A protein has these predicted regions:
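Hydrophobic core of transmembrane alpha-helices in multi-pass small-molecule transporters
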Residues: 114-115, 120-125, 184-198, 254-256
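Helix-breaking motifs and short loop linkers at transmembrane-helix boundaries and internal kinks
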Residues: 157, 178-183, 241-242
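Central mid-sequence intracellular linker of multi-pass
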Residues: 44-101, 240-311
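Structural signature of the two symmetry-related core transmembrane helices
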Residues: 160-175, 183
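Flexible cytoplasmic loops linking transmembrane helices in multi-pass membrane transporters
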Residues: 1-16, 71-129, 290-350
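Glycine-rich segments within core transmembrane alpha-helices of 12-TM secondary carriers
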Residues: 26-34, 137-145, 196-265
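Helix-to-loop junctions at the C-terminal end of transmembrane segments
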Residues: 145-157
């Protein structure tokens, strides 16, 4: 196929540019899975003081009497997780220092300075580990998605895998925005990444495979850069839309439009050839030639669709496993690449 791209179809033309653009939009959206950085962000919080008439987590964060009830940190801000022990009862308007001793105790209830995060809606208070768990669950999902998307890509095609992934990205992202409790939010976080985080790999393949060897490295660099650009886009949106539910709706609702890729993108030619779908592969190749204003000869099409190279008997799974075990190079790669991947995930996501 590379030889045909170089000599006939063109290494880079309108077809390749269109694929990179469409796949690039999908890759940008794949960066939105890191939205938990904003949706589960820490917000200012302090102990709720029922002795002073406070009854809600949305009470005024810094009333005039607050330093009578809550100690200050070394930087002059209110302690987030401790308060002075109460000795009597006051009101929201009058709560003097005489109602509190100097001994400290941990908070049981909280008042929040902002209502833009999961921490406020689900009253997480000082349970920072719960907020961090959101990112951990997301990372687990990115691990679980690999065999799932791999199976779908091999069985049904790269385009189908991409369309399913972007649909799941949009659907479960919107559902997550309507989470009614912490349990639902965490489950949706796991389902969201497990069923939707295969976007990057599928889009990357569709963008790069029909680009000629001369431009393939550049295309790969562009796709990787677009993922980073997606994180910047997400940051800008989060800057303008801070309430976490609205932020998620703003990020994921437009992603439903990418379901149209089922009609806009062509299936992977290499996959079609590997599955002996020769007529479909021919149509894609002719479409490439038409958009690039080039031609492809019948001889080249016949060579690509010749079953000669596929006529060799296939090895069964057991033979393939034994072949890997007996090859020092393959065995070393099989053992080390998972470690590289896991290490990269820990380093990248912290």
């Amino acid at each position: 196929l590379d030889e045909v791209l170089v000599t006939e179809l063109g290494q880079f033309g309108w077809y390749q540019a269109r694929n990179i653009l469409l796949a690039g939009i999908a890759i940008i959206s794949s960066a939105f899975f890191s939205e938990y950085v904003f949706t589960a962000a820490a917000v200012p919080h302090r102990c709720r003081i029922p002795e002073c008439g406070e009854t809600s987590k949305s009470d005024i964060f810094e009333p005039e009497w607050i330093t009578n009830a809550i100690p200050l940190t070394g930087s002059g801000s209110l302690e987030s997780c401790e308060r002075f022990v109460g000795l009597g009862n006051g009101t929201l308007d009058y709560c003097p220092a005489s109602l509190f001793g100097q001994a400290r105790e941990e908070c049981e209830e909280f008042v929040y300075g902002l209502d833009i995060s999961v921490a406020y809606d689900f009253d997480l208070g000082c349970r920072d580990w719960v907020r961090a768990l959101s990112g951990t669950v997301s990372s687990v999902g990115t691990l679980l998605v690999l065999p799932i998307i791999g199976y779908i890509s091999d069985k049904f095609g790269r385009k189908i895998a991409l369309v399913i992934s972007v649909f799941n990205l949009a659907l479960f992202g919107v559902i997550k925005a309507f989470s009614v409790n912490l349990t639902m939010y965490m489950i949706m976080q796991l389902v969201h990444t497990t069923l939707g985080a295969g976007i990057y790999s599928s889009a990357f393949i569709l963008a790069a495979e029909m680009v000629g060897p001369k431009y393939r490295v550049l295309t790969s660099a562009i796709q990787s850069s677009l993922f980073a650009s997606g994180q910047m886009v997400m940051g800008l949106i989060a800057w303008g839309i801070q309430p976490w539910r609205y932020l998620m709706l703003a990020l994921y609702t437009p992603c439903f439009l990418m379901v149209s890729y089922y009609w806009l993108l062509s299936e992977s030619v290499r996959w079609l050839l590997s599955k002996h779908k020769y007529e479909e592969a021919r149509k894609v190749l002719e479409n490439v030639a038409e958009l690039n204003n080039t031609t492809i000869s019948e001889k080249s099409i016949a060579a690509l669709m010749s079953p000669t190279e596929n006529s060799q008997p296939k090895e069964d799974k057991q033979s393939l496993v034994l072949r890997i075990i007996r090859s020092p190079i393959l065995l070393r790669r099989v053992c080390t690449t998972p470690i590289w991947w896991i290490t990269t995930i820990f380093v990248y996501y912290g």
